[in-house]
């Protein structure tokens, strides 16, 4: 799913999601299911402030439709604020970031892989973990441990 900025959304218990968003220092909480903070207090709501930030236009469908492919990138979202692709790998792959002027984030959703950057630094990344590459990284070698599925995001 892709919800543009200004859309009211809620995340249910037990969901594993990647919430990729544009840079912002503001989050408005308009309802909090009566949850309590660590001290037992209900968290502050921002109902009045949120009224000016909500995008009230209606979309028919927020699903991100794509055709799943193995061993090649599949574009999910490209907007003015970020681009996100999904990789479903059963084979090793080298990713070229030499033309990209941005940091890159990989979020491993399934399986695991070892990533090695162009400086020779290697890190194993497992499902539920993420890794941030500096904008100076020009190439990343992904060595799959059987299978790895991850999101790639950059600005």
Each language-model region and where it sits:
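Non-heme Fe(II)/2-oxoglutarate
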Residues: 14-16, 22-25, 29-40, 106, ...
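Structured core elements
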Residues: 2, 10, 19, 83-86, ...
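Glycine- and acidic-residue-biased ligand/ion/polar-headgroup-sensing regions
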Residues: 90-119
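Ligand-binding loop in jelly-roll beta-barrel domains
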Residues: 6-26, 135-155
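Short acidic-glycine-tyrosine-enriched beta hairpin
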Residues: 1-2, 117-137
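Surface-exposed loop/turn positions
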Residues: 7, 93, 101, 129, ...
């Amino acid at each position: 799913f892709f919800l543009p900025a200004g859309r009211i959304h809620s995340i249910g218990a037990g969901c594993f999601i990647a919430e990729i968003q544009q840079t912002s220092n503001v989050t408005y909480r308009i309802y909090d299911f009566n949850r309590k903070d660590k001290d037992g207090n209900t968290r502050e709501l921002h109902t009045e402030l949120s009224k000016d930030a909500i995008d009230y236009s209606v979309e028919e469908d927020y699903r991100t439709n794509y055709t799943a492919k193995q061993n090649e990138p599949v574009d999910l979202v490209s907007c003015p604020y970020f681009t996100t692709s999904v990789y479903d790998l059963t084979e090793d792959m080298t990713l070229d970031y030499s033309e990209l002027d941005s940091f890159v984030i990989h979020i491993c959703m399934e399986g695991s892989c070892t990533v090695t950057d162009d400086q020779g630094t290697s890190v194993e990344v497992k499902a539920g973990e993420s890794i941030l590459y500096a904008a100076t990284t020009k190439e990343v070698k992904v060595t799959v441990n059987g299978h790895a599925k991850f999101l790639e995001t950059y600005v």
